[in-house]
Amino acid sequence: MRILTTDHLFAWNRLEDCPSLTTVNRLLELLPDAKLLTALRAYRGKGRNDYPVAILWRVHLLRYILRHPTMDACLAELTRNPALRKVAGMQDGPIPEAWNLSRFAEVLGRPEHLALVQEIFRVLIARLAAAVPDLGVHVAGDSAALTARGDTQPQRVALPQPDGGRKEYTTEAGQVVQAYEWFGYKFHLLVDVRHEVALAYRLTPASTADVTAIPALLQQAQEVLPRPADGRGRIQTLAYDKAADDGATHELLAQAHIKPLIENRALWQSEPERMLPGHDGNSNVVHDEAGTLYCYDKVSATPVRHKMAYMGHEQNRGTLKYRCPARHEGWACPSDKKCNGCSVYGKTVRVQCALDLRRFPPIPRATREFETRYKGRTAVERVNARTKLFWGADDGNCTGAYRFHAHLSTILVVHAGFANLLAMAPRHEGQSLSPVRLSVIARRLRDAAQAAA
């Protein structure tokens, strides 16, 4: 990989379609897989050792590193490429057969081994988080549909089986205009918005709601991210779609001191706006379902609604501060004397966020900050597309829960490994004879990898 100094720290567009042998070897040497290999050897016991566990593990990884759609294609390349066999550790030994790798994938997907594969992913992400100060500050989450086939004897499998899922797209009136159905799993992700690096993932049956996976995802992400001195955690914002708009999720984020960027679901059928709690009919301040505050000009012949000026989130008070829009923007309002009286600053309204965490988040939905931050949610969609299309998570070539969980977890390990390689890669100045520079982050990651070796 040739990365320029002007490229992003994680230059995903620089990934090679056909990685060089140097890149493959660096990635294989980077993975902290000693515990996994020890557990696999212990599971094999005194059985036949025609193909050592380390070789099977490396061949299993090569399928995803080299982006082969099937294991047969990967084995065919190993047959005709002696240099690649040397990288995989098969200088003189025979090449495994396809059924050897199929059985290995089933063993790799067993819960005790799958936990160690997930531990490799967490260690790689923790290295990145320790070296990159802003990794995990702004996070986005989403889920994706993955097609899978279940086991013929599901009662013998300890992992969840795939089932049917359905996603409907509706209009504002609630009419279904499009529906998507699939049989398989739902892939949940938490991704850093800026760097497009996956911080946590979870695989659930397709019928599982998104909100049920958020607590586990958040806990997994907080475990791999360093905790600042204030003890509040590194994550500051979490962007999600309407699937995460429920009271339990907002309460969980409030306890973790994370600002939600979640679009609200339309649940009010009859009334477009309501009075603030504690306000009677004499008040001219109302709010809509999204939590946006408005004030009414009641002096004019026809009442006129104006959007109140948002002045910020008062963290110490736990309130959202709003001000008279006429005084803030400098225009004349017929209700100025009635609302503001002798006040120079104008009428001020403070709303306690605790009144309704869904309705009044620390970053109101009708603000430019919310709009800007919420656009970062597209990062998780790009990571989902990279996982499904670039590395083939949705190829549908796996049968059984064990194999599919091993399949997806291996893809995430490769994703985390390439993220480390991209951050560690030397940067070229752009000219053919220009010097190569190693950034501070690259040196930190290199030292961490050498210390773990």
State where each predicted segment sits:
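Charged, often Cys/His-bearing segments associated with DNA-binding zinc-finger transcription factors
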Residues: 1-38, 427-453
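Basic, short loop/linker segments at the boundary and entry of helix-turn-helix/winged-helix-like folds
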Residues: 17, 21-62, 66, 100, ...
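DNA-recognition alpha helix
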Residues: 71-89
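Short amphipathic alpha-helical "interface-anchor" segments enriched in bulky aromatics
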Residues: 78-79, 274-317, 354-403
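Major-groove recognition helix of helix-turn-helix-like DNA-binding domains
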Residues: 88-107
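Polybasic low-complexity intrinsically disordered regions
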Residues: 101-255, 261-265
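Long, low-complexity, polar/charged, intrinsically disordered or flexibly structured peripheral segments
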Residues: 316-362, 366
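Basic, amphipathic alpha-helical segments enriched in Lys/Arg and hydrophobic/aromatic residues
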Residues: 372-453
